């Protein structure tokens, strides 16, 4: 079963069919909530999801350190009244009654977090005491800083799996982010090396990105200019290239990047996004949000 087939199958499930995916036995656990998730529409109900960092079996004391999802059904009315985000607090330990997920035919590309699902039956206690989970929370809160002689100090945004920092680009300070797999340190190295390679060739990249964006978007900028009530200066490819200002670059471990430029109000404050890769060069330029 591929991922698309799996998603379609889940979306067609009624609530009783969905609940049958989980084991009948109810167990008590202590769980460390990471953050509230969202909700996906099923057949007649919504599946709410809450990310957790780890849980401990309340009766056996066995600790499960794998991240996962706590799920529970909600009605259309509850969804519309935003009854998703008021049941749990981030980074808080709860004592719950849950049902473990049973055996299920899953696509190979399914993430471990998505596989590790628990069905919420009842909330028994908030701010429960659990030494092992408290230690995990303390460790989770510690900042992870990647030090690099060229890129400087980069801090891991654990929620987004991004290393974030800033550096000098063409004598101006810009923000950078490395889009990585936080559980795979080789992706840290690849993204860092890709960013350094681009930085070492920043003069060429800066010129090429500006010219590329100007070629792709000057005509559109002129249309926006013509919609102004008051006269504004003519926009040419040269003036477009000169007016935009690089603000940030996001780099992946595979060498793909997105560069975000300030538009100097040519698009009334919308950013300009230039995308490409170190291997293939520049691929697209668009007006962003």
Per-segment meaning from a language model:
Residues 177-243:
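Long, charge-rich alpha-helical interaction segments
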Residues 97-136:
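OB-fold/S1-family single-stranded nucleic acid-binding modules
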Residues 76-97:
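Short nucleic-acid-contacting surface segments enriched for D/E, G, S/T with interspersed K/R
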Residues 29-32, 91-102:
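OB-fold and OB-like beta-barrel modules that bind single-stranded nucleic acids
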Residues 48-80:
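Short, structured beta-strand/loop micro-motifs enriched in basic residues and often containing a Trp
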Residues 237-289:
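C-terminal structured interaction module
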Residues 137-205:
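Contiguous hydrophobic, core-forming segments of folded domains
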């Amino acid at each position: 079963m591929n991922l698309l087939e799996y998603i379609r199958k889940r979306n067609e499930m009624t609530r009783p069919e969905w609940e049958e995916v989980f084991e009948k036995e109810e167990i008590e656990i202590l769980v460390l909530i990471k953050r509230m998730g969202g909700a996906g529409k099923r057949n007649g109900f919504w599946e709410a999801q809450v990310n957790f960092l780890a849980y401990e079996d309340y009766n056996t004391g066995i600790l499960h350190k794998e991240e996962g999802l706590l799920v529970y059904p909600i009605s259309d009315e509850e969804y519309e009244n935003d009854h998703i985000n008021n049941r749990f607090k981030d980074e808080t330990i709860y004592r719950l009654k849950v049902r473990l997920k049973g055996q299920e035919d899953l696509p190979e590309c399914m993430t471990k977090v998505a596989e590790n699902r628990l069905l919420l039956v009842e909330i028994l206690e908030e701010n429960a005491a659990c030494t092992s989970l408290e230690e995990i929370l303390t460790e989770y809160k510690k900042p992870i800083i990647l030090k690099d002689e060229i890129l400087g100090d980069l801090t891991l945004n654990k929620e987004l799996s991004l290393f974030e920092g800033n550096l000098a680009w063409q004598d101006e300070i810009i923000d950078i982010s490395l889009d990585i797999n936080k559980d795979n340190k080789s992706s840290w190295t690849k993204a860092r090396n890709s960013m350094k390679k681009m930085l070492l060739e920043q003069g060429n990249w800066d010129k090429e990105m500006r010219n590329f964006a100007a070629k792709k978007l000057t005509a559109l900028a002129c249309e926006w200019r013509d919609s102004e009530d008051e006269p504004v200066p003519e926009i040419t490819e040269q003036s477009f290239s000169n007016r935009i200002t690089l603000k940030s670059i996001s780099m992946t471990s595979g060498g793909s990047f997105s560069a975000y430029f300030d538009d100097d109000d040519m698009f009334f404050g919308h950013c300009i996004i230039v995308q490409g890769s170190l291997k293939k060069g520049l691929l697209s330029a668009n007006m962003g949000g």
